[in-house]
């Protein structure tokens, strides 16, 4: 194969479009020289597209220039080849041998043809426009044409190519091997003829990159030189770094905007991680992958629009709720009144540092004195947590620059204030059975409504616990862990709140088959019947009597048992083997009388000193119940135990410290009072008011007469089951007793919605709310003046319900003054007195209610010895 044939094939493959060296069968060769391209090859080729109406020559010039080229002689072409090759050598570093001279024509020197052929190939690869050498039939003896200038890619300059590449990076998107363009016009498929020759038409171009000096884009491949053969062309390769940038059509900021978005770098596809659930995550296999194909189409702006549309869809929000619920960890070790704070938070660290400063006395600017004990603290912490301290330190004594750094509080609950102070510095409120009342009292005094409400919920849960017939036989309340334990030892669910610190007395489990003979009263009890006196008296486990012998390391529990069978007794005995349990026993005080005619056997329990209390130990047998007194002569008729166990031998009195209350024997040789079993199936034991001044209530069987006439002529059978543990007030209804207890606790649980002032009664809040209203509804009945406050209307030493103002009360005018102006009273000197008398008035009203409840004329005379417990 000659060098000229190699040159032709190389030029045809590179697409340079050079004028060949020898004439032949070219369409533009009139001399009939050799064709510029190699002969047709047997490889498959694409069918040639229809020729355009006016096909431009390879170099993009017109018909005049083509005629001019045809008129050139071969000598002219050879003469022009030398300088062109030299210029190209200076512009590009050619791979020439070291012993070779400068580039010459085909006939210059021994190595001239080889160097010229290599020069032609290099120029054809670099610029695509080198002139042909040798005998060209189309030249007609004219000089050889000059080599084309250096062209980049499709004939454009370096600056143009750089600008186009920079613009192409932001517009064209390569994905899955295809080009995604922002252009709204339809791109023509195939190759287009650029500004180069027809053989160069294989370069890919979009509608914005149509090359040439006004050249038209044509589908298919260009027509090469020769006998109309089509030449297979290849698109020009782009830099690898540019292709990587074009393929990256995903924005990393989308992952922050849409947390549900999942992106695959391998496939370039996006999907929703919440809507598309795999079978491992609990999703269905039949469900199509939602959002896998829909979110991967279009341009970048269109994709983000699809993401936003999917984000606000209803179906996605449903999956979003389920995904968020699954991410929330389950809470273990739930506690109602004490939650563990986040130790890594700034707030926790700040409070801990302030608490350490308080304990060490650093920068403490106030001393709080409570019952002689001094507490160091910071004013800013106290003001931030208590409305009382805020009023004390911020709104009072503004005229004195040097305020007193010592504050005395008129409260006696030292332990309660210590808990409140720890709460202000830690955020944790520690409530136990011993300090709940004190903490609530101190919080009410300091006007901390949230703490008061928490204490109320704590106490309310305790009051709601009662021993009923359907209740379990044994309940253990562990105050250290504050978790209930059933009889089988299993802990109940966390939502069950056990916070009881009131001991509910229970009359239960008298001895089975007990034969009692005393003064003609013979009763044979055939079966065990439980009588329950619910909430008859409350005993606080934190009282001094209860706390005398309690050690700090012991677990305090209350146990209510039903000892009806031997099997239950054995189970309870096994469970309580290693426990220190508290037992509550009703007290029967002594009396000097020597007979049982009155049958007054007991009165409401009173906390007796431990040294005067006879204690009973629990034994597994229930055959008999006998209690020996100090003189040892007699046996008590029956004993009443809240957690009743009896002595097996029936004669030993226990000396253990497990029992705080016991049966008190009389000083005489005879035991005058005891429990007498009844004969009725409905009520075994009932309370009846006694005739003696010492004992008002006693137990007697139902078979006795239901009405008795005593010395004072009163007759009734009533059981006053609700008695105040702090005073002698006895209520008939539970709600009345709760209102009465507010007098002793001093809890101000009702607050004004406008100013936040606390009150003990709801009616006091309603009356106080009139102060904030513009309506003046308080009018003096004498002078007809209208006042803003109810405290301004009232007699000085009487109740303000009479509606007489202070001035009229001082003047003691019986008549009225009709013509006095109905002006607003701007001064209210009795406001402080009104606030001070609020609690006193509540006391008067509650005492009146108590007197009405104890009125014998209003007692229930239905004939029942024991009233219903569910009033």
UniProtKB/Swiss-Prot annotation:
Residues 364-433 form the BTB domain. GO terms for molecular function: DNA-binding transcription repressor activity, RNA polymerase II-specific; RNA polymerase II transcription regulatory region sequence-specific DNA binding; telomeric DNA binding; zinc ion binding. The keyword Zinc-finger applies. Residues 27-37, 77-103 have a biased composition (Low complexity). The modification Phosphoserine is found at residues 210, 565. A zinc finger (C2H2-type) spans 722-744, 750-772. Residues 39-56 have a biased composition (Pro residues). It is found in: Nucleus. InterPro entries: BTB/POZ_dom, SKP1/BTB/POZ_sf, Znf_C2H2_sf, Znf_C2H2_type, ZnFinger_BTB_dom_contain. Pfam families: BTB (PF00651). SUPFAM superfamilies: beta-beta-alpha zinc fingers (SSF57667), POZ domain (SSF54695). One of its GO terms (cellular component) is nucleus. Its main location: nucleus. Residues 65-76, 830-854 have a biased composition (Acidic residues). Disulfide bonds: none annotated. Keywords: DNA-binding, Isopeptide bond, Metal-binding, Methylation, Nucleus, Phosphoprotein, Repeat, Transcription, Transcription regulation, Ubl conjugation, Zinc, Zinc-finger. The keyword Transferase does not apply. Gene3D superfamilies: Classic Zinc Finger, Potassium Channel Kv1.1, Chain A. GO terms for biological process: negative regulation of transcription by RNA polymerase II; regulation of transcription by RNA polymerase II. Residues 1-156, 177-228, 812-871 are annotated as: Disordered. There is a cross-link at residues 245, 468, 483, 497, 573, 672, 684, 696, 706 (Glycyl lysine isopeptide (Lys-Gly) (interchain with G-Cter in SUMO2)). Residues 14-26, 126-135 have a biased composition (Gly residues). The modification Omega-N-methylarginine is found at residue 126. May be involved in transcriptional regulation. This is Zinc finger and BTB domain-containing protein 10. It comes from Homo sapiens. The gene is ZBTB10.
């Amino acid at each position: 194969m000659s060098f000229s044939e190699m040159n032709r094939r190389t030029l045809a493959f590179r697409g340079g479009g050079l004028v060949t060296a020898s004439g032949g069968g070219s369409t533009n060769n009139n001399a009939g020289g050799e064709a510029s391209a190699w002969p047709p090859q047997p490889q498959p080729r694409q069918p040639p597209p229809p020729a355009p109406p006016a096909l431009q020559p390879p170099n993009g010039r017109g018909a005049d220039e083509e005629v001019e080229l045809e008129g050139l002689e071969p000598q002219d072409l050879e003469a022009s080849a030398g300088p062109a090759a030299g210029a190209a050598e200076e512009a590009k570093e050619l791979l020439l041998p070291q012993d070779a001279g400068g580039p010459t024509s085909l006939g210059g020197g021994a190595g001239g043809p080889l160097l010229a052929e290599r020069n032609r190939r290099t120029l054809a690869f670099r610029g695509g426009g080198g002139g042909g050498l040798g005998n060209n039939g189309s030249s007609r003896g004219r000089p050889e044409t000059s080599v084309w200038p250096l062209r980049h890619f499709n004939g454009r300059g370096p600056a143009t190519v750089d600008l186009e590449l920079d613009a192409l990076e932001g517009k064209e998107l390569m994905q899955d091997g295809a080009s995604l363009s922002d252009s709204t016009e339809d791109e023509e498929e195939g190759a287009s003829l650029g500004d180069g020759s027809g053989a160069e038409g294989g370069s890919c171009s979009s509608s914005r990159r149509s090359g040439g000096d006004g050249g038209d884009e044509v589908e298919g491949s260009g027509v090469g030189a020769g006998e109309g053969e089509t030449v297979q062309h290849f698109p020009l390769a782009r830099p690898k770094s540019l292709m990587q940038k074009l393929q990256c059509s995903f924005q990393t900021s989308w992952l922050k905007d849409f947390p549900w978005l999942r992106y695959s770098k391998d496939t370039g596809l996006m999907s929703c991680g919440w809507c598309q659930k795999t079978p491992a995550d609990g999703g269905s296999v039949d469900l199509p992958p939602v959002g896998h194909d829909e979110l991967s189409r279009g341009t970048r702006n269109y994709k983000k629009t699809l993401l936003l549309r999917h984000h606000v869809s209803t179906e996605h929000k449903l999956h979003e709720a389920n995904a968020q619920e699954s991410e929330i960890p389950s809470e273990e070790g739930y506690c109602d009144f004490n939650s563990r704070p986040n130790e890594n938070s700034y707030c926790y660290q700040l409070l801990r540092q302030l608490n350490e400063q308080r304990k060490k006395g650093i920068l403490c600017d106030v001393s709080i004195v409570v019952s002689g004990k001094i507490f160091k603290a910071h004013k800013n912490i106290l003001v931030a947590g208590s409305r009382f301290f805020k009023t004390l330190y911020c709104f009072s004594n503004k005229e004195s620059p040097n305020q007193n750094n010592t504050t005395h509080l008129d409260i006696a609950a030292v332990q309660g204030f210590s808990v409140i102070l720890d709460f202000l510095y830690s955020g944790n409120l520690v409530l136990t059975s011993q300090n709940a009342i004190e903490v609530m009292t101190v919080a009410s005094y300091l006007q901390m409504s949230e703490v008061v409400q928490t204490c109320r919920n704590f106490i309310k849960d305790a009051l709601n616990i009662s021993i009923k017939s359907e209740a379990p036989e044994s309940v253990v309340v562990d105050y250290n862990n504050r978790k209930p334990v059933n009889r089988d030892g299993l802990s109940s669910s966390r939502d069950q709140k056990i916070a009881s610190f009131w001991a509910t007395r229970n009359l239960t489990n008298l001895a089975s088959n007990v034969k009692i003979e005393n003064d003609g009263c013979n009763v044979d009890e055939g079966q065990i019947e439980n009588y329950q006196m619910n909430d008859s008296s409350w005993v606080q486990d934190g009282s001094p009597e209860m706390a005398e012998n309690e050690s700090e390391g012991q677990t305090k529990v209350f146990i209510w048992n039903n000892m009806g069978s031997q099997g239950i007794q054995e189970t309870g005995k096994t469970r309580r083997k290693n426990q220190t349990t508290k037992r509550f026993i009703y007290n029967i005080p002594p009396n000097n009388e020597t007979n049982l005619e009155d049958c007054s056997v007991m009165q409401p329990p009173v906390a007796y000193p431990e040294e005067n209390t006879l204690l009973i130990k629990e034994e597994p047998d229930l055959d008999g119940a006998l209690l020996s007194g100090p003189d040892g002569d007699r046996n008590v008729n029956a004993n009443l135990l809240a957690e009743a166990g009896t002595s097996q031998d029936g004669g030993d009195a226990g000396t253990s410290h497990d029992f705080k209350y016991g049966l008190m024997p009389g000083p005489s040789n005879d035991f005058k009072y005891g429990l007498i079993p009844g004969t009725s199936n409905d009520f075994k034991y009932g309370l009846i008011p006694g005739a003696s001044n010492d004992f008002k209530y006693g137990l007697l069987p139902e078979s006795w007469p239901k009405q008795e006439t005593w010395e004072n002529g009163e007759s009734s059978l009533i059981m006053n089951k609700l008695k105040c543990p702090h005073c002698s007030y006895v209520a008939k209804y539970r709600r009345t007793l709760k209102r009465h207890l507010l007098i002793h606790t001093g809890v101000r649980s009702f607050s004004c919605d406008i100013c936040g002032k606390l009150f003990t009664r709801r009616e006091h809040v309603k009356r106080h709310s009139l102060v904030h209203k513009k309506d003046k509804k308080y009018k003096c009945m004498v002078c007809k003046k209208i006042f803003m406050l109810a405290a301004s209307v009232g007699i000085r030493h009487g109740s303000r319900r009479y509606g007489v103002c202070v001035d009229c009360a001082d003047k003691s005018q019986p008549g009225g003054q009709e013509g006095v102006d109905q002006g607003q009273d701007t001064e209210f000197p009795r406001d402080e007195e009104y606030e001070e008398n609020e609690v006193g008035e509540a006391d008067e009203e509650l005492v009146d209610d108590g007197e009405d409840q104890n009125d014998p004329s209003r007692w229930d005379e239905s004939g029942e010895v024991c009233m219903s417990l569910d009033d």
